[in-house]
Amino acid sequence: AMPARPFAPGIERLAQVHNKHAFIRLADRLGLAVPETTLLQSCADLEAVRGQSRELVFKPAWSRFASHVLLRPSPDFLDAISPSPSAPWVAQRFVAGEEISAYAVARDGKLKALALYRSIHRADKGAGICFEPVEDAATRRLVERIVAGTGWNGQISFDLMREADGKVLPLECNPRAVSGLHFFRDPARFVDAVLGDGPEVAPDVTAPQMVRLAMWIYGLPAALRAGDLGRFRMAMREAQEVLDWPGDPAPVKAQ
């Protein structure tokens, strides 16, 4: 027997939500609106959707940091991928709107911490390197539905899209910590809520957060290509360094 209970679901549940097709099926069974998502396990599966490629997003069923994502590619771009049962892909309907990310911690299906945010700058198409908090009641209800429906224990995160009419659709799930954790800076309150008997803890950081070194490496070149230096300068001026913790200079020095 393990000396301590892992603060996470069983491996089967973790695999289910991390798989980009299985997660959408789970959300659908929980009564949530979801984007049409097709599992691709063969060249025949790929050919069946090739004609609609301009309306779809293609990504490996097992992936993170937006690796290998093809966003509304031309049909010939699909020649670069070869889905199989051991390396499946998904074809998901492209959803226009505002992307929202969610980081949550739950115990026995009840939310104990939740941070909602949007990425202002990214490392290429992947992880956010500058992000700001947002509030959205529909997104909170979606997260509550999933953690309650799964009896979730531990950390769980989501990439979602809010459409123009306010409807929020889940795109994928990451059963781990993500950048939203940086919006909690009071260790005592966080630990009391997550591991003790304290009430749900709200984020105590309201300013945008950034990884300054990554902003110079990824954000500046992207701003130059897009002709958007003004937004880059504003982010560098207003956002706080996520690694800058009072009394602990080591993370910033390591960067």
Feature locations, PLM:
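Glycine-rich phosphate/pyrophosphate-binding beta-alpha loops
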Residues: 66, 120-125, 130-131, 174-187
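Phosphate-binding site of ATP-dependent enzymes
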Residues: 73-142, 161-169
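Gly/Ser/Thr-rich active-site loops/lids in small-molecule metabolic enzymes
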Residues: 136, 179-197
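Conserved N-proximal alpha/beta basic substrate-recognition cap immediately N-terminal to
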Residues: 1-41, 48
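ATP-grasp fold ATP-binding core
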Residues: 27, 37, 50-69, 86-97, ...
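Conserved metal-phosphate-binding beta-hairpin within the catalytic cores
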Residues: 150-183
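Peripheral (often C-terminal) accessory segments that flank ATP-dependent C-N-forming ligase machineries
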Residues: 192-255
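Short amphipathic alpha-helix with an adjacent loop that forms part of the alpha/beta core around
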Residues: 46-52, 79-84
